[in-house]
């Protein structure tokens, strides 16, 4: 996937990977550190985060690997992370929005938002907005948003029941919020010249991570009939391969001209549906993201 000639492609470049202390994010960080990148990884817990950074330093020989503590569930937490990044590095070449959430029971964050919506949509919008000037100053730069092909399973209007108060099924809410992430990412890509900052989406594939281990047949009722097969595929696929796919989007010269694209598989660009490609839907997601970031913590929202 990453050619031998690309092994040193990231020397002198700085990458931030959210949720980089475990699972796919950790594996992505390992690959990019081996390619010579200065790597910043984030997580909620300091102990495991520092341990993860130390392990990557030992394995890669890259001393410029650092952990930053962050609460991605709140807008303020993402803003504080951006402050840490600005203080830690002079520029940012790649932002990998990898962290996400899937919760078996409904809960709300300190901002008053349903937690899946906060982690998978509001948080990435807030962080990307804060760090965009740093990316632009480092042009050509990249924003890689990790999503799930599960977004295709969400068929209702994506702008209804945002707080999931009418119905809460964890896998469905996850698909809903990932669809919103796809839409807002495409809206951002249209706003930025490709030679300045590219914005792409990647589905790294199913793999055996802490998130997938927490899933049950009740998580995604639409997959209940094939759940044993889904479980088998998850168990047989390691997060290492998924991390390589994300790292490919973050580093490979072979995708330097792409923006506003969704990647799957090897990974290769895949055509999205008319719904995802609809500029009106993308703009509605953009406005929604701006409203939720601005309104964080001011009141509880519904609908």
Report the location of each language-model feature:
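A recurrent short beta-strand within the Rossmann-like NAD(P)-dependent oxidoreductase core
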Residues: 143, 199-201, 246, 260-263, ...
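C-terminal helical subdomain
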Residues: 177, 227-270, 279-287
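Short acidic, glycine/proline-rich loop/turn micro-motifs
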Residues: 108-109, 272-276
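A glycine/serine/threonine-rich, flexible loop-to-helix segment
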Residues: 208-230
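Rossmann-fold NAD(P)H-dependent dehydrogenase/reductase core
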Residues: 1-215, 293-303
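Short active-site-adjacent structural elements
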Residues: 150, 270-272
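C-terminal amphipathic/interface module of NAD(P)-dependent oxidoreductases
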Residues: 275-303
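Short glycine/proline- and charge-enriched loop/turn segments
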Residues: 159-168, 220-228, 266-270
């Amino acid at each position: 996937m990453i050619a031998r000639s690309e092994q040193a492609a990231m020397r002198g470049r700085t990458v931030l990977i959210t949720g980089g202390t475990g699972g796919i994010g950790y594996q992505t960080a390992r690959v990019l550190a081996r390619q010579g990148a200065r790597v910043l990884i984030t997580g909620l817990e300091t102990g495991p985060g520092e341990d993860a950074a130390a392990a990557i330093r030992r394995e890669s020989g890259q001393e410029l690997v650092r952990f930053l503590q962050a609460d991605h569930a709140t807008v303020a937490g993402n803003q504080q992370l951006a402050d840490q990044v600005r203080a830690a590095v002079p520029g940012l070449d790649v932002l990998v929005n990898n962290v996400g959430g899937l919760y078996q029971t409904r809960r709300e964050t300190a901002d008053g938002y349903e937690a899946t919506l906060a982690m998978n949509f509001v948080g990435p919008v807030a962080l990307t907005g804060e760090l965009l000037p740093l990316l632009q100053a480092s042009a050509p730069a990249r924003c890689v948003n990790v999503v799930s092909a599960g977004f295709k399973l969400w068929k209702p209007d994506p702008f209804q029941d945002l707080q999931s108060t009418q119905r809460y099924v964890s896998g469905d809410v996850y698909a809903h919020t990932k669809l919103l992430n796809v839409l807002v990412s495409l809206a951002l890509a249209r706003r930025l010249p490709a030679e300045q900052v590219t914005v792409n989406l990647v589905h790294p594939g199913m793999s055996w991570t802490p998130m997938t281990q927490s899933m049950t047949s009740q998580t995604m009722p639409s997959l209940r009939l094939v759940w044993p097969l889904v479980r088998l595929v998850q168990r047989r696929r390691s997060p290492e391969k998924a991390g390589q796919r994300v790292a490919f989007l973050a580093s490979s010269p072979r995708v330097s001209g792409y923006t506003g694209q969704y990647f799957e598989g090897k990974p290769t660009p895949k055509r999205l549906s008319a719904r995802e490609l609809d500029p009106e839907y993308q703009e509605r997601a953009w406005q929604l993201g701006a409203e939720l970031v601005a309104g964080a913590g001011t009141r509880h929202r519904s609908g």
